[in-house]
């Protein structure tokens, strides 16, 4: 459980790497995917020093995200390079800065500063930024607790297909946080998130990752995981949604569940939601 909590935190910070790798043949990102961590540091630094915000973000993530071997993390430099990218308006770096402030690992925790950077990312339609604001208002971290605002942010991102926000929206309906309690809508939104990966596929992926962790060569620097943290976050969120469904089934009638399933189908059709491609 602790491992997956760490991965969820890292995935929010490093989520740009996988999507960027899909957009470009950048040697920097290719080296990360191939686990050539020290070479990646060299190549990413060259591009970062030339002002490339994507390379700056990747370099910052490497400096705090490489594990094992004799590599020593450099949190100060990690924050420096990511902030360089964020100050250029690169939304994924803005999100990374927000998460750094929220989690207090790379830099001291400062939820109020995190909110500023979440807002910058959200203003550029970064759904993780929108979700970050939802979480702050839901739990009163750095802001006065406001369930209605949290609900609005969850709904905004959920309607665009953001899985964590779909779960957050469902829980808001379940717990009557910012909206009138509605178990049918709660089940529908949790179901939408839960069905993005089927149970057998989820189990197979989790087993594969478990085997990789158990057979990891800890004498060598490791960074390949940074290229797929977004995928791992999606897996964890989907698994969490599936567990919530089991609880909801114990609290709802067959009639309510069938109504919720119908609603979920209508929402998916209207919003053109699709299953995750892993």
Model-derived segments and spans:
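Hydrophobic face of amphipathic alpha-helices that form TPR/SEL1-like repeat modules
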Residues: 27, 43, 58-67, 96-103, ...
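TPR/TPR-like alpha-solenoid repeats
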Residues: 47, 62, 85, 100, ...
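Bacterial N-terminal signal peptides
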Residues: 5-15
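Terminal, low-structured helical/coil segments at or just beyond the last alpha-helical repeat
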Residues: 207-208, 214-278
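Short helix-capping/linker turns of helical repeat alpha-solenoids
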Residues: 24, 36, 49-52, 66-69, ...
């Amino acid at each position: 459980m602790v491992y997956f909590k760490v991965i969820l935190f890292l995935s929010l910070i490093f989520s740009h790497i996988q999507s960027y790798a899909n957009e470009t043949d950048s040697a920097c990102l290719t080296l990360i995917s191939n686990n050539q961590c020290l070479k990646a540091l060299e190549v990413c630094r060259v591009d970062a020093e030339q002002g490339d915000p994507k390379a700056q973000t990747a370099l910052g993530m490497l400096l705090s995200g490489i594990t094992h071997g004799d590599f020593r993390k450099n949190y100060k430099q990690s924050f420096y390079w990511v902030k360089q990218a964020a100050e250029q308006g690169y939304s994924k770096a803005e999100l990374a800065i927000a998460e750094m402030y929220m989690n207090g690992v790379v830099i001291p925790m400062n939820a109020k500063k995190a909110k500023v950077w979440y807002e910058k990312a959200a203003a550029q339609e970064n759904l993780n930024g929108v979700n970050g604001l939802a979480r702050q208002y839901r739990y009163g971290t750095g802001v006065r607790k406001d369930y209605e605002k949290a609900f609005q942010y969850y709904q905004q991102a959920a309607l665009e297909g953001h899985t964590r926000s779909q779960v957050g929206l469902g829980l808001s309906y379940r717990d009557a946080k910012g909206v009138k309690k509605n178990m049918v809508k709660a089940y529908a939104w949790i179901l939408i998130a839960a069905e993005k990966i089927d149970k057998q596929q989820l189990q197979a992926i989790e087993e594969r990752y478990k085997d990789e962790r158990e057979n990891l060569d800890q004498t060598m620097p490791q960074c390949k995981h940074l290229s797929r943290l977004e995928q791992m976050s999606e897996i964890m969120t989907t698994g969490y949604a599936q567990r919530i469904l089991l609880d909801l089934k114990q609290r709802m009638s067959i009639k309510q569940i069938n109504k919720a399933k119908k609603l979920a189908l209508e929402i998916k059709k209207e919003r053109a939601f699709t299953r995750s491609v892993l």
